Amino acid sequence: MVSASPRGDSLQRAVSVAYSPGSTFKVAQAIAMLSEGTLSPTTQYSCARGFTQGGIHIGCHAHTSPRAVVGALGTSCNAFFCKSFMDMIGNAKYRTRAEAIDRWHAYMSSFGLGRCLGTDVGPEATGLMPSADYLKRVHGQWTPQTIMWVGMGQGEVTATPMQLCNLAAVIANRGYYYTPHLCRATPDHPIDLAYRSKHVAMGTPQAYQITIQGMRAAVVSGTCASINRAAYAICGKTGTAENEGEDHSLFIGFAPMDKPRIAVAVVVDNGGFGADMAAPMASLIIERYLTGRLREYSKYQVEHWAGQAVTPYVPPTDTAKAVKAPTAKKHKARHK
């Protein structure tokens, strides 16, 4: 994906730009917490259109409460994932908070997040998954509340669209991936071994299955119900990431549910809610790949999107500035 921004750059945004993943990141959180046993499939957290912690309010949208993890993924509950993430970091099974966050970091790294994947499209941005050392450098003394926004994919986490697509592939495969690449093998140029080697991710089979159920719930009756199809079962997760200017619109998913053939990630700069732009675009990609054609209504959607160019936000100055960790006041309700 090459930028057509007013900057006139030629960035390969699929691999060279890292975004806040927003609520798409909740699937990675679910696998880690379920696998570690700090969250059970039946654990419920309440949400009254958000929650307040230490005088800070994190918003959410209206949905039934309390929720267990499948329902929380389906409705993209911010309260559930912030609370459960804080409970993981503060869990007594770990000797220290540093041990807990580093264990969490190991899961994220095994999914291909926070590091270069080694794809043949580049240059790659690493993204960021905070470790204990990173948090100590940035915050000094920190608590689970300091980083609670990480639970819902905001704060100090970033990922490239390729990394998010790879995350979808990890889940579709129930726990493994192959390094993404574009070049196919030819008789004279076989595929490099690096692209044929299986990478096994952390996580229990049950954790993957429950997370997949949550992603399916999001499509059947949750935040991306508009892309549900009778012909094939899509599993997905929307995201809306805060940003200067309009929010970014995100979606990750795969299909079919039981014998997946395609994993997709869509990021629309300044596109607004994930359910409004990224998810419908992803559904068109999935439909064309699985069926070899587009329905008439889908063709209409393509024409509609073609006329809906989104102009990325351009700051008033090009002066380079250090990236600063988001502050508590910035975070509002972002779920779709």
Indicate residue ranges for each PLM-predicted region.
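Beta-lactam-recognizing serine transpeptidase/beta-lactamase-like catalytic domain environment
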Residues: 1-23, 28-274, 316-336
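C-terminal, active-site-flanking charged/polar segments
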Residues: 258-260, 272-296
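Short C-terminal domain-edge/linker segments immediately following a structured domain
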Residues: 91, 182, 266, 284, ...
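Short, intrinsically disordered/low-complexity patches at protein termini
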Residues: 63-65, 128-129, 287, 297-302
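Short, highly charged C-terminal tails/helix-capping segments
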Residues: 297-323
